[in-house]
């Protein structure tokens, strides 16, 4: 153990991934994973599981050598999925056009005013009216959380920001749609703003608890948190935009796969098999696929950028039940495998009985599955069950039922992969190159990570008849991904050359007398502003800046095209700091 105290490279990265079943922690020194820990996630109080994982992974290490801590957490995801978010008063400025009564999570409060597609304020929102309405609405709701979103607010955030100033006298937390996303799509921005305010209280408490836990262990390194788009940012900054930390589990998986260097350039299906679910992601030419416009939060489409990841209800602790003469595997999880002291048999128990896993008590797992086999035989003898072509008629022993359990799990995973591939191959084509040279996704390679990867991964490869890779440290891939995540921020600059107007919605900036005339000039300005913002946040200013999108439209007036509408979106390139050995 003493040898661990002398670490090559001097500085270490600590990664934490709070999953639905397990909380993982890793320490990375240079390009080596030098310590790992896996502890059960304590849903009633996440900090208990986080504390246990920290204590386990830090044993024998000098915490003063930790350079950065990066966390991937389910706290926001759980709040949203379980519908436990706080009440939010949602204010919208829609102007004419589409009826939005039924597309938001709550009934919005409509405010007078209108900004057109060029960013021209056609009708101002009266300040005194906002104050009066806010007092009345807040008295009824009793909440101190609000969200504000205006149609075409990304073209001119003036109305959103002025309304926010008026609401500060009434509400403690206010989110703006245009500050969260610079992209056109009023409904998505509005939904993001609503959920951003709704999860702020729980995120703020969680942030304080994590900071206290690190402080108690003498960890003074900067604390970052992973975002759904695979980037990380300082926890302090994310207090104003916690909705972006939802669904970070898939992001951690994707980054972990990148860091482990196992994807290659083939069409690859990556599986992260946890205790409850299997996350499926597709990779083309070494890059993961992203959602087109943003991730859906419950049934509501948001502006939060995310990797395209789909989950199916199969995990190591998927419960096994006999229902109406049928054997089901998942999607529910009720606790640990019987081999680990649980009360109902799981997929993990089946893997233990078949010799694919060697944890826990084999005898307990075998006895539980034998009891299930006996129950199946008793059910088949009932006159109420149709035994024709029923697989259950062959079940006699614990091994028989274990094989059937694994087969059903593999069928569910295969179906999930087929559906994801089908959706990908039906995506709309936007450029001529994709018509001339279509890149149809045909799986060529499977990569499996997650706690159940070593136990189920080989069977998946055999079942799908594809080569399968299970990397070293597959069980803690998500924590590795979190530890190595690069910082990312995204900015949008919109320039109207006729009006000499420059707008940066994410920063709430509106500048008159802009002299930029060409797209190349706007790109350079965007890079300059992004570098300045990165410096302000204490990020690595040497990191590559990526131009995500350029839109350049001529403005035709009097049969002449003299002016332009130019929109440029840039970001610090997402990815990992380096590979691990």
Positions of the model-derived regions?
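N-terminally biased helix-coil "hinge/interface" segments that flank
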Residues: 4-581
């Amino acid at each position: 153990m003493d040898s661990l105290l002398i670490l090559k490279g001097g500085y270490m990265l600590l990664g934490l991934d709070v999953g639905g079943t397990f909380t993982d922690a890793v320490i990375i020194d240079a390009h080596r994973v030098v310590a790992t820990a896996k502890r059960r996630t304590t849903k009633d109080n996440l900090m208990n599981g986080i504390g246990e994982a920290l204590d386990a992974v830090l044993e024998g290490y000098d915490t003063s050598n930790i350079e950065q801590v990066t966390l991937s957490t389910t706290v926001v995801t759980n709040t949203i999925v379980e519908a436990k978010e706080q009440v939010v008063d949602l204010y919208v400025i829609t102007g004419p056009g589409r009826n939005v009564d039924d597309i938001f999570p709550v009934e919005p409060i409509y405010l007078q005013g209108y900004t057109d597609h060029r960013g021209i304020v056609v009708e101002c929102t009266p300040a005194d009216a906002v104050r009066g309405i806010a007092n009345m609405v807040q008295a009824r709701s009793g909440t101190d959380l609000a969200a504000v979103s205006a149609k075409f607010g990304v073209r001119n955030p003036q109305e959103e920001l002025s309304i926010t100033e008026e609401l500060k006298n009434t509400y403690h937390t206010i989110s703006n749609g245009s500050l969260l996303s610079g992209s056109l799509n009023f409904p998505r921005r509005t939904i993001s703003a609503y959920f951003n305010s709704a999860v702020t209280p729980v995120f703020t408490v969680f942030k304080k608890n994590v900071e206290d836990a690190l402080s108690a262990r003498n960890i003074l390194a900067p604390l970052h948190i992973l975002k759904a788009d695979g980037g990380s940012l300082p926890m302090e900054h994310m207090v104003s935009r916690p909705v972006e930390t939802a669904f970070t589990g898939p992001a951690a998986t994707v980054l972990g796969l990148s860091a482990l260097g196992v994807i290659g350039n083939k069409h690859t299906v990556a599986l992260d098999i946890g205790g409850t679910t299997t996350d499926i992601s597709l990779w083309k030419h070494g890059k993961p696929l992203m959602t087109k416009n943003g991730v859906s939060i419950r049934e509501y489409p948001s502006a939060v950028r995310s990797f395209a990841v789909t989950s199916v209800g199969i995990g190591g602790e998927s419960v096994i039940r006999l229902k109406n003469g049928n054997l089901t595997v998942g999607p529910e999880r009720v606790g640990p495998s019987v081999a680990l002291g649980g009360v109902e048999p799981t997929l993990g128990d089946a893997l233990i009985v078949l010799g694919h896993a060697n944890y826990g008590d084999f005898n307990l797992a075998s006895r539980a599955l034998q009891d299930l086999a006996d129950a199946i035989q008793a059910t088949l003898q009932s006159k109420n069950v149709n035994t024709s072509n029923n697989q259950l008629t062959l079940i006699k022993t614990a091994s028989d039922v274990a094989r059937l359990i694994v087969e059903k799990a593999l069928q569910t995973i295969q179906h999930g992969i087929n559906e994801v591939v089908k959706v990908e191959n039906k995506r709309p084509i936007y450029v001529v190159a994709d018509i001339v040279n279509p890149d149809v996704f045909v799986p060529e390679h499977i990569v499996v990570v997650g706690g159940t990867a070593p136990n189920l991964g080989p069977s998946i490869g055999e079942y799908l008849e594809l080569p399968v890779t299970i990397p070293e440290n597959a069980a803690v891939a998500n924590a590795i991904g979190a530890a190595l995540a690069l910082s990312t921020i995204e900015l949008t600059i919109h320039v109207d050359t006729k009006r000499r107007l420059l707008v940066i919605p994410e920063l709430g900036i509106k500048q008159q007398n802009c002299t930029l005339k060409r797209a190349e000039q706007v790109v350079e300005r965007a890079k300059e502003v992004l570098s300045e913002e990165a410096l302000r946040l204490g990020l690595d200013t040497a990191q590559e800046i990526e131009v995500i999108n350029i839109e350049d439209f001529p403005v035709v007036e009097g049969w002449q095209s003299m002016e332009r509408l130019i929109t440029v979106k840039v970001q610090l390139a997402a990815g990992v700091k380096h590979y691990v050995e």
